[in-house]
């Protein structure tokens, strides 16, 4: 039988594999903590030593998801992980790169422009589900298959 890992060792193990928000780390460690105080002490120590950083987590999350998802969805996901709105707003991609991401996602999913209103609505719903705002969705639908579309034109 293996000896039980300490809470500190479990936290180090989790953080060695991926960036995790404070709330995410707390959720993963809570079942193994003997008390809330012990858990908070470990979380505070890791934050003080900069082994766990919500800012690094937010940067990594946005870097990995921003090519497929819009700012609304990214903001909501970060808020669920306890990242404040100001931090997430500062890290989100600018409008032109978000519009380009919407166009790229649309082109990948749908190989041709919408033939009728029903298909156009389907494409719009798809982008909205991905977290793109209404203005970005309209721009993407309008310019996705333009040959001369450049970022932000």
Curated annotation (Swiss-Prot):
GO terms, biological process: regulation of DNA repair
Record has Cytoplasm as a keyword: yes
Broad class of where this protein is predominantly found: cytoplasm
Superkingdom of this protein's organism: Bacteria
GO cellular component, one term: cytoplasm
Keywords (A to Z) from UniProt: Cytoplasm
Compartments (UniProt record): Cytoplasm
Transmembrane annotation, as ranges: none
HAMAP family: RecX (MF_01114)
Family: Belongs to the RecX family.
Protein purpose: Modulates RecA activity.
NCBIfam families: PRK00117.2-5
The name this protein goes by in its record: Regulatory protein RecX
């Amino acid at each position: 039988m293996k000896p039980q890992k300490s809470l500190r060792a479990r936290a180090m193990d989790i953080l060695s594999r991926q960036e995790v928000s404070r709330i995410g780390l707390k959720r993963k460690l809570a079942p193994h903590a003997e008390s809330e105080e012990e858990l908070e002490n470990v979380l505070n120590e890791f934050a003080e030593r900069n082994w766990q950083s919500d800012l690094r987590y937010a940067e990594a999350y946005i870097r990995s998801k921003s090519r497929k998802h819009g700012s609304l969805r990214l903001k909501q996901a970060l808020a669920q992980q306890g990242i404040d709105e100001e931090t997430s707003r500062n890290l989100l991609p600018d409008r032109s790169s978000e519009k380009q991401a919407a166009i790229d996602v649309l082109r990948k999913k749908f190989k041709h422009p919408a033939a009728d209103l029903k298909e156009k609505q389907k494409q719009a719903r798809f982008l909205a589900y991905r977290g793109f705002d209404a203005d970005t969705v309209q721009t993407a639908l309008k310019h996705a298959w333009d040959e001369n579309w450049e970022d932000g034109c």
